[in-house]
Amino acid sequence: MINLRKTHPLMKIINHSFIDLPAPSNISAWWNFGSLLGACLIIQILTGFFLAMHYTSDTLTAFSSVAHICRDVNYGWLIRNLHANGASMFFMCLFLHVGRGIYYGSYLYKETWNIGVILLLTVMATAFVGYVLPWGQMSFWGATVITNLLSAIPYIGTTLAEWIWGGFAVDKATLTRFFAFHFILPFIITALALVHLSFLHETGSNNPTGVNPDSDKIPFHPYYTIKDVLGVVLLLLTLLLLALFSPDSLGDPDNFSPANPLNTPPHIKPEWYFLFAYAILRSIPNKLGGVLALLASILILLIIPLLHTANQRSMTFRPVSQTLFWILVANLITLTWIGGQPVEQPYIIIGQLASMSYFLLILVLMPLAGMFENYMLKPKW
């Protein structure tokens, strides 16, 4: 009898994607983050679905409904903590996944990479609108500050901002539509993730050496399924430790106070995973310039394939590029720290220097390093 998983129309797709998929034999734990992101997405959709059953998207009751979930709903506190900290785990995996792509030259699969950048932007949008929903002080003021950036767009800016708000300020209409966006976007992310995977399966996975692995492939199951299961177990363990022992450590204390349009918090700042971009936004003393720099800090990922100058794909055997890569990582950590600090010296100048070096590293130094390494590899005799 012919194996059903190889003949059934639906099972065949699953078989080619997760069972008989030929995978390079040498991919390391850095290749686990794709499956971890899938696990994060499933956790977020499930916990979000249960939260949506009890949440009300009205300015008068939103804050109370979140308190009601935590106090009165069976395991509501756990569902809420898993959802809030699940977002942090999601972004941690995303940043590591993107970092892996840059280090090992995975961006040369241009279609997969571009869909990945669109996915990153969509997840960031989802997280932003979701952060507004509890209607705490930082939710409200974060929404006010970030949506206000639209008004920097010449000519249509103010109209656009008021269109997004559904009025003349962040209010009931804004909260209702943000809830609608937050509900629909994860399903769009799921669809994009499937497109991302289908493009990846057109070429096959990259590997740490950056060399074509076609001559040495192994089946995905059982070798990488068991490896992914281990990754998911470690992810769940970390998430549970965070959600059970320190659920509020990554949040903002201002969000324990209901939104008050008449009282501005002393330091308005987003969640930790947006701080690097927020620092770049604040480092430019001009509103439109700041907005453009904020957009450029993410959209720069789209041109990374065009900036690849090295003859080798991966950074595994490129020490100069490796050094610059880790300087870039340190730079992003510095930006994250600066984003959480008040706007005063010395933080202003550190933020400006870090923002400048971020763009300098990606646009100038890393392409030059690739060219230098090509030159060093040429025989000199």
Curated annotation (Swiss-Prot):
Cofactor requirement: heme b
Keyword field contains Heme: yes
Keyword set, alphabetical order: Electron transport, Heme, Iron, Membrane, Metal-binding, Mitochondrion, Mitochondrion inner membrane, Respiratory chain, Transmembrane, Transmembrane helix, Transport, Ubiquinone
Any Pfam family matching the protein: Cytochrome_B
Subunit record text: The cytochrome bc1 complex contains 11 subunits: 3 respiratory subunits (MT-CYB, CYC1 and UQCRFS1), 2 core proteins (UQCRC1 and UQCRC2) and 6 low-molecular weight proteins (UQCRH/QCR6, UQCRB/QCR7, UQCRQ/QCR8, UQCR10/QCR9, UQCR11/QCR10 and a cleavage product of UQCRFS1). This cytochrome bc1 complex then forms a dimer.
Physiological role: Component of the ubiquinol-cytochrome c reductase complex (complex III or cytochrome b-c1 complex) that is part of the mitochondrial respiratory chain. The b-c1 complex mediates electron transfer from ubiquinol to cytochrome c. Contributes to the generation of a proton gradient across the mitochondrial membrane that is then used for ATP synthesis.
Protein name per UniProt: Cytochrome b
Organism of origin: Murexia longicaudata (Short-furred dasyure)
